[in-house]
């Protein structure tokens, strides 16, 4: 994927309402959906609780945006129109109840944490705090626990089996290094690496050098406003702010 890529970010679109044919006509090369894991509460029609889409309770396809069958249909439509399909994924945390706790809807098998997971991050330039502590009230999952890793990697396979080409990895800078390496390996194994990238925004430049397992975007300028899409120059998504 060395040519310039233009991604249409279908933020909070229902899968069966994404205008695939029109997106292709406008010159986009990929469509990115919002996360598709089930959320702790229904998403309101006016989207005043859209934040809930980033608070999953499991690692299975299906929420208010669509079912696994909707995703398969979307993938087929994308591929028929020469587009790749990217899905936003949330691996750092599961849903909370109110803050620094866990939603009662989350099953016990997903409740594996670090010793400091329920303490808020204070220093965002400290790699240990970034990866082992709570992100704004969302406790960090223990991504070195095999039950968690297996559940998440099974979710990636579900996405691949549905026709997804790659992933946008939410809160990438908050994932522990050993997990990031395994995640990159899994994406390669599934054939999803080329169209996957990690979110690393507002990170110290020195820390950015550590996030070299997969391509990144590292500033807000790569995410357009008004849900119109992100223009990402591949050659590993490099730009003036991200030479790594």
What residues fall within each predicted segment?
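Short glycine-centered, acidic/aromatic-flanked micro-motifs in structured strand/loop junctions
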Residues: 10, 61, 171
